[in-house]
């Protein structure tokens, strides 16, 4: 990414005890030194509120991908996996889309997927995943919570995992938005 690209964030998603939750922070960073916004909303409800999507990367690029993904959801009657695969194929195959600098996590009540511009659609083995600059911190915290604090709800796990990432990663803030299914 260029030095003037708006980027950096953390998105975390988990399925736990029959519930699903996705959390994202609110920080938008310009380059490596300037916080441009602290209250961005990077987790959205799509397809009549039945699908959650979160992005890490360039904001403008992510909005383009949200629109394309929602179109694919409509086209395939809400089939998350099919819509994600079709988006990844289009993203990888289109010369202009290939330039987009973002990653998505998409989820419904049954599945979590990471979608990237390299054509990858990845389902995590353990019903939790994180992307973005603080993704490894959130993922580590989430795995620990799932193993040792399984009494927490999916929403609580998502919030606390993002909170840990915000405490460590300078590109992640603690203005956390959590959406649940």
UniProtKB/Swiss-Prot annotation:
Localization, per the record, is: Cytoplasm
**Cellular compartments per GO CC:** HslUV protease complex; proteasome core complex
What keywords sit in the KW lines? Allosteric enzyme, Cytoplasm, Hydrolase, Metal-binding, Protease, Sodium, Threonine protease
Residues at which Na(+) binds:
166, 169, 172
Q: Which InterPro entries match?
A: ATP-dep_Prtase_HsIV_su, Ntn_hydrolases_N, Proteasome_sua/b, Proteasome_suB-type
Main location per the UniProt record:
cytoplasm
Per the entry, what modulates this protein's activity?
Allosterically activated by HslU binding.
**Which Pfam families does UniProt cross-reference here?**
Proteasome (PF00227)
Q: Which HAMAP family match?
A: HslV
The job of this chain, per UniProt, is described as: Protease subunit of a proteasome-like degradation complex believed to be a general protein degrading machinery.
**Self-association or partners: how does it assemble?**
A double ring-shaped homohexamer of HslV is capped on each side by a ring-shaped HslU homohexamer. The assembly of the HslU/HslV complex is dependent on binding of ATP.
Q: What is this protein called?
A: ATP-dependent protease subunit HslV
């Amino acid at each position: 990414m260029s030095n003037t690209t708006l980027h950096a964030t953390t998105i975390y998603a988990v399925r736990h005890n029959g519930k699903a939750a996705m959390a994202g922070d609110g920080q938008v960073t310009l380059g490596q030194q300037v916080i441009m916004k602290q209250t961005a909303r990077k987790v959205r409800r799509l397809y009549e509120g039945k699908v959650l999507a979160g992005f890490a990367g360039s904001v403008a690029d992510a909005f383009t991908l949200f629109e394309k993904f929602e179109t694919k959801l409509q086209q395939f009657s809400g089939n998350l996996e099919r819509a994600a695969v079709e988006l990844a194929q289009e993203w990888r195959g289109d010369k202009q889309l290939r330039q987009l600098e973002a990653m998505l996590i998409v989820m419904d009540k049954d599945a979590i997927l990471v979608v990237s511009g390299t054509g990858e659609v990845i389902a995590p083995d353990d019903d939790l995943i994180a992307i973005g600059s603080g993704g490894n911190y959130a993922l580590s915290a989430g795995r620990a919570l799932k193993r040792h604090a399984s009494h927490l709800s999916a929403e609580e796990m998502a919030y606390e995992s993002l909170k840990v990432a915000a405490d460590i990663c300078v590109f992640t803030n603690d203005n956390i938005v959590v959406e649940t299914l």
